Amino acid sequence: MKQTRNFDEWLSTMTDTVADWTYYTDFPKVYKNVSSIKVALNIMNSLIGSKNIQEDFLDLYQNYPEILKVVPLLIAKRLRDTIIVKDPIKDFYFDFSKRNYSIEEYTMFLEKSGIFDLLQNHLVSNLVDYVTGVEVGMDTNGRKNRTGDAMENIVQSYLEAEGYILGENLFKEIEQNEIEEIFSVDLSAITNDGNTVKRFDFVIKNEQVLYLIEVNFYSGSGSKLNETARSYKMIAEETKAIPNVEFMWITDGQGWYKAKNNLRETFDILPFLYNINDLEHNILKNLK
């Protein structure tokens, strides 16, 4: 297929977001995380306003040692994280899932980190509410993954709208060895003779052609974009050696504005380089 599109015009149609209503915060995940430690948090609530908080904490710990596991979240850390503190006396590596220091040293952590002050001076009134807010803030770290998922969901919806059926002629997150087995095709040209494990986001099968599809979205710039463009250019070139197989790349995001040179090179040799605007204009109907 000869490339007839104008790169700059195509680039100008990149969208600024793929965020849907639930993109910004995964509230079900937040509620689930809080619910799993709600009892321990309510036990810790008894320390709010304490006049002898160190002594009260030690007494509380003796009866409810599980309260130690909620401490990391009070400073926006996960239980699995080792919390490292550099002290003039020595370095500490606190493990809150399995105690590795004396309880007195953990008490020192709560004192010096400011947690006791938070509780003793009524800076919070309820730790369940407080941790819910912490979880919302920490959930923003998951937006990067949700961006990729959102882009894949968009692409899948367009593929299914064209009549592709998951498990029949549409496959998701499938490795090259599975593709070779299902479709009796040799992909060694793009896998270094089978020495490289390659997984594609989607594969679709038409009457004549098998399409190997990669999907991504970049809202910001960075070296990753150039690496991706170069990598997919190579795959596009290598795929030409495989009969009845085409490589398709569906990407979007205004991060490409600052990484357009490598993208242009791939655009020039890859006829099946699309964005969401292309999908909206029924580009998939043109596939053989």
From Swiss-Prot:
Signal peptide: none annotated. Keywords: Endonuclease, Hydrolase, Nuclease, Restriction system. InterPro entries: Restrct_endonuc_II_DpnII (IPR021191), Restrct_endonuc_II_DpnII-like (IPR007637). The keyword Nuclease applies. One of its GO terms (molecular function) is type II site-specific deoxyribonuclease activity. GO terms for biological process: DNA restriction-modification system. It is an enzyme of class 3 (hydrolase). It catalyses: Endonucleolytic cleavage of DNA to give specific double-stranded fragments with terminal 5'-phosphates. Belongs to the DpnII type II restriction endonuclease family. The gene is dpnB. It holds the Pfam family DpnII. Its EC number is 3.1.21.4. This is Type II restriction enzyme DpnII. Homodimer.
